[in-house]
């Protein structure tokens, strides 16, 4: 006896004998999970843009969906100005991703040591 395995992610149909169903399904599920994870990682990476000055920050906020990575001085006034001007707010300051993409705050130009991911709420 045979069955047809229809993959929802690739639209691929494969005929499998009932004796092999358990083995094949385990392989298919692992492959599907890995493919979905890689697709999600690629999507995320393609929706993160770096801004090095305020004009670039505003241009990205107006034209590109996703997150903006930019340096911030830590001053709440800068955060509020960014929110007022662009409707973009800080989303996170990751612990492990503290590379310095610039030495200055994207908003005021003062020395900055915090890498922040910014984004719009939808």
Protein language model regions, located:
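NTP/phosphate- and nucleic-acid-binding module
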Residues: 1, 5-122
């Amino acid at each position: 006896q045979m069955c047809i395995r229809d993959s929802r992610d690739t639209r691929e149909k494969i005929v499998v004998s009932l004796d092999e169903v358990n083995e094949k399904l385990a392989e298919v599920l692992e492959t599907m999970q890995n493919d979905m994870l890689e697709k999600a990682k690629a999507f995320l990476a393609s929706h993160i843009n770096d801004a090095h000055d305020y004009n670039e920050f505003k241009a990205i906020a107006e034209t590109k969906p996703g997150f903006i990575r930019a340096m911030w001085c830590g001053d709440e006034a800068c955060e509020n100005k960014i929110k007022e001007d662009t409707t973009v707010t800080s989303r996170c300051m990751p612990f492990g991703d503290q590379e310095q993409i610039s030495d200055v705050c994207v908003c005021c130009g003062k020395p900055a040591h915090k890498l922040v991911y910014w984004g719009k709420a939808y």
